[in-house]
């Protein structure tokens, strides 16, 4: 088996595996197990001290104006 044949075989294998995984995470309109796989995310709240562009999504549920290291006033999660 030469290099080109090996590369083609790996591409075919990757495509087959990708199709199998895509089937496993197909959208489930009833909100079942497949939907949980598709919408699996990391925590969405913003930790304390980080900039908060909106008054929501802070882990503390509070966002206030604070002075940063350059002297500008920015909104940060409490």
Curated annotation (Swiss-Prot):
Disulfide bonds: 45-59, 52-63, 58-77
Taxonomic superkingdom: Eukaryota
Cross-referenced SUPFAM superfamilies: omega toxin-like
Cell division recorded as keyword: no
Subcellular location: Secreted
Primary residence: secreted
Keyword tags: Calcium channel impairing toxin, Cleavage on pair of basic residues, Disulfide bond, Ion channel impairing toxin, Knottin, Neurotoxin, Secreted, Signal, Toxin, Voltage-gated calcium channel impairing toxin, Voltage-gated sodium channel impairing toxin
Signal peptide: 1-22
Any single Pfam family the record assigns to this protein: Omega-toxin
UniProt site positions, description: Critical for insecticidal activity: 51, 68, 76
Biological processes per GO annotation: defense response
GO molecular function: calcium channel inhibitor activity; sodium channel regulator activity; toxin activity
Residue stretch(es) of the prosequence: 23-41
GO CC terms: extracellular region
Family to which this protein belongs: Belongs to the neurotoxin 08 (Shiva) family. 01 (omega toxin) subfamily.
Note: This toxin comes from a male specimen. It is observed that propeptide sequences coming from male specimen are identical but have only limited homology with the female paralogs, but the reason is unknown.
Biological function: Insecticidal toxin that reversibly and voltage-independently blocks both mid-low- (M-LVA) and high-voltage-activated (HVA) calcium channels (Cav) in cockroach DUM neurons. Also causes a modest block of insect sodium channel currents (Nav). Induces potent excitatory symptoms, followed by flaccid paralysis leading to death in house crickets.
The record's note on its domains: The presence of a 'disulfide through disulfide knot' structurally defines this protein as a knottin.
Name of the protein in question: Omega-hexatoxin-Ar1f
Native organism: Atrax robustus
